A protein has these predicted regions:
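Non-catalytic linker/capping segments at the edges of enzyme domains
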Residues: 1-82, 102, 107, 120, ...
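Compact, glycine-rich, soluble single-domain proteins
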Residues: 79-80, 92-95
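Short nucleic-acid-contacting surface segments enriched for D/E, G, S/T with interspersed K/R
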Residues: 88, 123-131
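Acidic, glycine-rich low-complexity segments with interspersed aromatic residues
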Residues: 90-91, 104
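N-terminal export/assembly segments and adjacent metallocofactor-ligating motifs
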Residues: 109-113
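Conserved double-stranded beta-helix
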Residues: 115-118
Length: 196
């Protein structure tokens, strides 16, 4: 799709999210558009069913089909399969990062943390649908640093029942931090503290 069409869309299917993860969805990306979603198996979304923005606020809703053979059910826990709660939190960060790109932010995405996380349910192999609803409380582009940030509150539901609550989840886009030379050593081959 063309960049203007990408920015105008209000939903994305599984193929499109996978193409975004591989950096091939947008045919004419602006300079600096380097963010990606993770590829499977860490991609925790099958589709974005709603995305909208009103000024500094917005909303993004993603869904994932639960599969009996999902990789995490094979190891977490043996004899008592349950999706790790942290993967639900990661789905929220993935959606916020995608929102930043869709809203016009440029750079590579990074999760920046969250406030309160509460788990009051679980995802099991015979569940059908995980829905992640994120209300973006603030989206801002920071021209001096060339970065963008989204902060949101999220509810994760399984088969229509709320089971996780995540408050003040934060994801940012940052320019000139991508490490494209993997597995070779290079300028950005090591981690450590990021300057804000």
């Amino acid at each position: 799709v063309k960049y203007a069409e990408f920015r105008a869309r209000d939903r994305f299917d599984s193929r499109e999210l996978l193409a975004f993860a591989h950096g091939t969805l947008v045919e004419d990306p602006p300079e600096g558009m380097s963010a990606r979603l993770p590829t499977p198996p860490l991609l925790m979304l099958d589709r974005v069913v709603e995305i909208s923005r009103r000024g500094p606020r917005g909303r993004i809703v993603g869904e994932r089909d639960v599969r009996l053979d999902d990789w995490f059910f094979q190891c977490h826990f043996l004899g008592d399969p349950v999706q790790p709660g942290c993967l639900g939190v990661d789905a929220v960060w993935q959606l916020l990062g995608f929102f930043c790109n869709w809203a016009g932010g440029l750079g590579s995405g990074r999760a920046l943390g969250c406030g309160e996380v509460e788990f009051f349910g679980q995802i099991r192999p015979h569940d059908r649908l995980v829905r992640v609803e994120v209300d973006v409380r603030r989206y801002a582009e920071l021209p001096e640093s060339g970065s963008a940030i989204a902060i949101g509150d999220a509810t994760l539901l399984v088969d229509g029942e709320p089971i996780y609550s995540i408050r003040r989840a934060k994801t940012g886009l940052f320019r000139d931090i991508a490490y494209r030379g993997y597995p070779n050593p290079g300028e950005r081959a090591r981690g450590g503290r990021m300057e804000r």
